Amino acid sequence: MSAKTEEILESLKSLSLLEASELVKQIEEAFGVSAAASAGVVMAAPGAAGGDADGGAAEEKTEFDVVLESFDAAAKIKVLKVVRNATGLGLGDAKALVESAPKTVKEGIAKADAESLKKEIEEAGGKVTLK
């Protein structure tokens, strides 16, 4: 790699996501290309090679919202305890959140944390979706 390309690469590494997004838009306008078209081709190739077993990279989100859809009336207290522990809300606020289902319990959390919270709520008697 030439010194010039290494310098450009190092500059790109220091960009924030917002700056990188703006840069992509400027490159698209300057060169009359579309990054979305080339990204689609790149994303399709691994999916085709893998046999589409797991749905591909379309589900590769990094942040998830945990939404309490409903709960078993008999398990309300158990669900309330899990929600309260997960959110740090007081008893009244957690109760209001649970009773107003469907309602978002936590927003923008990592996939592993979201799946763990989903499992906890479901074990307590709630129905949860990840968005």
UniProtKB/Swiss-Prot annotation:
GO terms for molecular function: mRNA binding; structural constituent of ribosome. Pfam families: Ribosomal_L12, Ribosomal_L12_N. GO terms for cellular component: cytosolic large ribosomal subunit. The keyword Ribosomal protein applies. It comes from the Bacteria. One of its GO terms (biological process) is translation. Keywords: Ribonucleoprotein, Ribosomal protein. NCBIfam families: L12 (TIGR00855). Forms part of the ribosomal stalk which helps the ribosome interact with GTP-bound translation factors. Is thus essential for accurate translation. Belongs to the bacterial ribosomal protein bL12 family. This is Large ribosomal subunit protein bL12. It comes from Prochlorococcus marinus (strain MIT 9301).
